[in-house]
């Protein structure tokens, strides 16, 4: 085959890979953000939502936010927000584009190293379509996975370019790309090890193996190790910073909580569990709770690993791709296998995004070899490969759909796992946000059965109870949360809300102040304290609290609204109007802001504008008595008595015996020129 025809075949393969991958992941364009880290990465991160700014860039490079230093990932999320705002579907599609790019780069690198187009294409297709990779692609918070892998693949391509014709410029290009990858996610710490494996096969740079493309540039092991030292030098500070950031964020699990023995057992078992899910990808979940394994299970898993490793070493000279693929799989999982435990998961699908490439290489090269040994026709290999890819595509299509929103995601997780505290918690939070308080209560109760000493669970259950109007039960749960964790600022804040709802303003004020002593940057506590101060007539203090909330969280619509209320009560109508408008720009469906803006405009004799705001409030909430009353007043002042009467009557239907509405309606009836109406 000519070089030109090979090039066109490669183009055709790339087009097919891109189209099929895009088709499988196309549904994500309608998906939502989840409450599983997407809030920290995007929806509640003001630095990211501000787009690419100098201040944001400085923050990204100087702050180990959310337990990891990954400035390029933050910049990528910032750029998304600048281009698409909070359009979740667009953020998802960017992840898909990176996944497609990674797929094409993997094909390109393997094809260049091996000149085996179809086998390289098969590896790339498995990478693109395997269900275990859905988590890395369909989850916005895993931008770090697809972005760091993009630089991983570029580094490998640049390294192959360097090996073909070694010079300083090509080497520095590979080194620079590796450094960029580390700034997206420190998963690249194992890349020098993988480059050594590639030196063995398929590059054939050692005296123990032949090059896959027949070009042998033999180097000593010492030379190859020295060649990787600059890469290793990058990994050392990256590893230290990552460990420090995770420890600083409380993510590192200490040895007294999780002994070394349990970690080793989980690591050995997880290697085999990942293998099982690679070849039988069912029951996949966004979170796998930590489990204890018996010695029998651990020994069985160890025997599997030892058996495969022994077979690979035995066949290493005849089938070097087995050696490279297997050690790729084992080695790239080391940072995330749980020996240094970060978080409470026992394993995670996303951790396989890079490691599975090693297994795919083993399958892609071993399958044809086995069929040749068994004298099977070539079409058997083609049919087997096609069946595998179709199966992966179908399973991935189903798995993708679980990531549509919080409810679909965590209901699926609960269906395929047991005693999953995180799934109960996040599903409960999602139901709480939807106002499904009874269902949320059930989820938080289930969470407490699993983790009875969880202060956050008691706090969340209390929120659900408060939403059902069960104030006494909610207060008891907030108190339980604070007995377990007295410095839980959110529980103090929420307890303040419950007490304020009972009219216990002094006690509520004390709880808000307690929350702010613990967490001075809790904008919601500043805002809630302001509401209580307004109710106590302490307007100057309320204004100060609203302003404090807005310094922390400029897009907190409720703080703008309450600041408007405080200013209006001080007679600063123009300033109040500005705050109401600011609140409505952020949250256009805030009926209180529409109504109060209308009242402020009416006080400036801007009656037409005021009536427009009352009407806007009633379009959103037709049973809003205050807006009906204010609209009635405005209509009466315009002499539109019949319409005003209708609004007053509607007000009294919603709030019987409300004095202002009774007085307004009585005045109309008493002063009407129609005698029958007066009587």
Residue spans for each PLM region:
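Conserved alpha-helical positions within TPR/SEL1-like repeat arrays
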Residues: 422-432, 456-467, 490-501, 524-535, ...
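Polytopic membrane enzymes that build or remodel cell-surface glycoconjugates and lipids
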Residues: 1-439, 443-445, 449-460, 467, ...
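Short coil/turn linking the two alpha-helices of tandem helical-hairpin repeats
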Residues: 398, 469, 503, 537, ...
């Amino acid at each position: 085959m000519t070089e030109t025809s090979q090039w066109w075949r490669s183009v055709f393969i790339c087009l097919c890979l891109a189209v099929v991958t895009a088709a499988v992941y196309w549904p994500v364009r309608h998906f939502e953000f989840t409450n599983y880290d997407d809030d920290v990465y995007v929806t509640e991160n003001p630095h990211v939502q501000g787009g690419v700014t100098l201040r944001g860039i400085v923050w990204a490079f100087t702050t180990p936010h959310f337990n990891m230093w990954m400035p390029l990932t933050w910049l990528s999320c910032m750029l998304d927000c600048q281009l698409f705002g909070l359009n979740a579907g667009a953020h998802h599609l960017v992840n898909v584009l990176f996944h497609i790019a990674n797929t094409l780069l993997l094909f390109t690198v393997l094809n260049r190293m091996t000149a085996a187009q179809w086998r390289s294409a098969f590896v790339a297709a498995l990478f693109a379509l395997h269900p275990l990779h859905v988590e890395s692609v369909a989850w916005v918070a895993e931008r770090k996975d697809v972005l760091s892998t993009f630089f991983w693949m570029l580094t490998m391509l640049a390294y192959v370019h360097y090996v073909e014709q070694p010079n300083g410029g090509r080497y520095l290009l590979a080194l620079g790309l590796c450094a960029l990858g580390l700034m997206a996610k420190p998963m690249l710490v194992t890349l020098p090890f993988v480059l050594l494996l590639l030196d063995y096969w398929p590059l054939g740079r050692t005296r123990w193996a032949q090059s896959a493309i027949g070009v042998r540039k033999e180097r000593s092991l010492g030379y190859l190790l020295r060649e990787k030292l600059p890469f290793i030098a990058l990994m050392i500070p990256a590893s230290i910073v990552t460990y420090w950031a995770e420890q600083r964020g409380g993510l590192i699990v200490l040895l007294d909580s999780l002994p070394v023995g349990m970690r080793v057992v989980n690591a050995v078992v997880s290697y085999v569990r990942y293998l099982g899910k690679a070849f039988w990808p069912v029951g996949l979940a966004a979170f796998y709770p930590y489990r204890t394994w018996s010695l029998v299970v651990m020994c069985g898993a160890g025997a599997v690993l030892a058996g495969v490793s022994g077979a690979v070493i035995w066949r290493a000279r005849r089938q070097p791709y087995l050696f490279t693929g297997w050690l790729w799989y084992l080695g790239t999982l080391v940072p995330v296998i749980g020996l240094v435990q970060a978080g409470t998961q026992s394993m995670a699908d996303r951790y396989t995004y890079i490691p599975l490439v090693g297994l795919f290489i083993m399958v892609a090269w071993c399958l044809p070899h086995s069929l040749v040994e068994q004298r099977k026709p070539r079409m058997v290999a083609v049919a087997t490969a096609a069946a595998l890819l179709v199966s992966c595509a179908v399973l991935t299509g189903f798995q993708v759909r679980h990531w549509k929103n919080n409810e679909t995601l965590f209901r699926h997780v609960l269906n395929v796992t047991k005693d999953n505290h995180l799934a109960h918690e996040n599903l409960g939070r999602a139901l709480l946000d939807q106002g499904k308080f009874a269902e949320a209560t059930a989820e938080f109760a289930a969470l407490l059965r699993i983790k009875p000493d969880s202060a956050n669970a008691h706090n969340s259950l209390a929120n659900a109870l408060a939403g059902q109007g069960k104030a006494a039960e909610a207060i008891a749960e907030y108190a339980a949360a604070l007995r377990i964790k007295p410095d839980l600022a959110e529980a103090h804040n929420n307890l303040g809300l419950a007490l304020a709802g009972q009219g216990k303003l002094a006690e509520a004020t004390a709880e808000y102040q307690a929350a702010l002593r613990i967490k001075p940057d809790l904008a919601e506590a500043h805002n809630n304290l302001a509401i209580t101060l307004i109710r106590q007539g302490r307007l100057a203090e309320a204004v100060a609290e609203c302003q404090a909330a807005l310094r922390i969280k400029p897009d907190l619509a409720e703080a703008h609204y309450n600041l408007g209320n405080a200013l209006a009560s001080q007679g600063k109508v123009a300033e109040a109007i500005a705050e109401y408008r600011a609140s409505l720009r952020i949250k256009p469906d805030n009926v209180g802001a529409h109504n109060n803006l209308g009242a402020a405009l009416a006080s400036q004799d801007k009656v037409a504008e005021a009536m427009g705001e009352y009407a806007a409030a009633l379009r959103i909430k037709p049973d809003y008595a205050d807006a009906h009353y204010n609209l009635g007043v405005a209509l009466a002042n315009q002499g539109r008595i019949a319409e005003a009467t209708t609004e007053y009557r509607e007000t009294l239907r919603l709030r019987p015996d409300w004095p202002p509405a009774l007085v307004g309606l009585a005045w109309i009836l008493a002063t009407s020129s129609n005698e029958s109406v007066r009587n």
